[in-house]
Curated annotation (Swiss-Prot):
Family matches, as NCBIfam families: PRK09395.1, PRK12488.1, sss, symport_actP
Cellular compartment(s): Cell inner membrane
Lineage: Bacteria, Pseudomonadati, Pseudomonadota, Gammaproteobacteria, Enterobacterales
GO terms under cellular component: plasma membrane
Gene name as annotated: actP
Protein name: Cation/acetate symporter ActP
GO biological process, one term: sodium ion transport
Family: Belongs to the sodium:solute symporter (SSF) (TC 2.A.21) family.
Keywords associated with the record: Cell inner membrane, Cell membrane, Ion transport, Membrane, Sodium, Sodium transport, Symport, Transmembrane, Transmembrane helix, Transport
Primary site of residence: membrane
Pfam families cross-referenced by the UniProt entry: SSF
Domain of life (superkingdom): Bacteria
GO terms of molecular function: acetate transmembrane transporter activity; glycolate transmembrane transporter activity; symporter activity
Amino acid sequence: MKRVLTALAATLPFAANAADAISGAVERQPTNWQAIIMFLIFVVFTLGITYWASKRVRSRNDYYTAGGNITGFQNGLAIAGDYMSAASFLGISALVFTSGYDGLIYSLGFLVGWPIILFLIAERLRNLGRYTFADVASYRLKQGPIRILSACGSLVVVALYLIAQMVGAGKLIELLFGLNYHIAVVLVGVLMMMYVLFGGMLATTWVQIIKAVLLLFGASFMAFMVMKHVGFSFNNLFSEAMAVHPKGVDIMKPGGLVKDPISALSLGLGLMFGTAGLPHILMRFFTVSDAREARKSVFYATGFMGYFYILTFIIGFGAIMLVGANPEYKDAAGHLIGGNNMAAVHLANAVGGNLFLGFISAVAFATILAVVAGLTLAGASAVSHDLYANVFKKGATEREELRVSKITVLILGVIAIILGVLFENQNIAFMVGLAFAIAASCNFPIILLSMYWSKLTTRGAMLGGWLGLITAVVLMILGPTIWVQILGHEKAIFPYEYPALFSISVAFLGIWLFSATDNSAEGARERELFRAQFIRSQTGFGVEQGRAH
């Protein structure tokens, strides 16, 4: 039965702009037993790690941050594993397969946010926070209002991202493994809950590390075999690809992805600032011992991800040569079997045979598990630490907080499974785009200004943050993706697909205006507290390290 894999595009941040290139009609494939066996090996191994981790999770610190004893190198790998989705691998390589050079430009968009995290956020975040970014945002501001806003921003981002991942996971597994969609969604949800429920951050970290290593190895092998085919010459790679691609030399020309400068700028800002506001990424900086290790984490993560996206570019051009020009991988109509999303999977078969094809399919499944585990833990910590322990029941014991966190994991898991089933045939490609827009318009401005602007007050942060969040949601609804494609209206009220340029501007302007006009005694006190916060953020003085942090 024919299915539309728009959900796969949704598992890639802001992939909606490339939906035409990386989505299309696909068929459920025959059961891939080699892939299933390899995936079962991965599951058994990671469940063993979860059991090992569960014996070492004795406190709140262990559960949320793995005791703060993850090294910078390990955390860099885990961050890369948390950030690189299955669709980063399949989607971007498919985009290169169809559009050529534009795929490289698009993939680089995922890296532009990391220098901001490295130079502006990582060190200060680690010096000021303990478990969530709300610890930093509320350091000198009113705990209640700021934590509620931060938790809401986190939960909305996590929920949207999680639904998109679950639907994408079901479609992807149905495509690669031949398993039933509902079985796939339940399987992902159950494994996700087991990793987080029993192993906490320690198990999640090692699942992400293993996934990153497997993905980097698989992509490296594919790129190596492609380059070997062309004599390790990029000139030969591009020449052969241009010779067989229907667009010819045009695949080396940029500019086909974004329709106008406003959309390009808005997309870029959303990718850049959204990355710096993702709660499951920011939470990883509390797993290392100090600010130095936090900086090293970003350095290693950026290196791993940069290397990975270069590999997807080579893989995409390799697919043009070895898959696009091979009738074995096409149906009777001349289209790629399974759709363009299968370009990298077919290439795995072309360069490594059925065994390597099974390995790549299993790795694609593993990437989904690593991402949803990180999302679930971030959502649970927002509820248990930010809302329960610091707003609704101040002074709650560690045991009570951990109990709430684990209950939240179960609730999030069940909700994710239910919504994954309900949204099976819905267009959810907008969800991750909206998640990034909210992260960029609500979370990022508050984090940045709370650390760098001495005049920020609770009033400004609250009003500006909520304005940014609401603006992002409203403009996304009124834009072409939801208003026209989903709701069926003839013309969009808001003409641009990406609201980030406007919603980020509203957030920063609102925070500045309402802080600058705040003449209350509370506002004056909050401004006076900035100096002490600044000294701690720069020096780390007073920060607890390692297992005690």
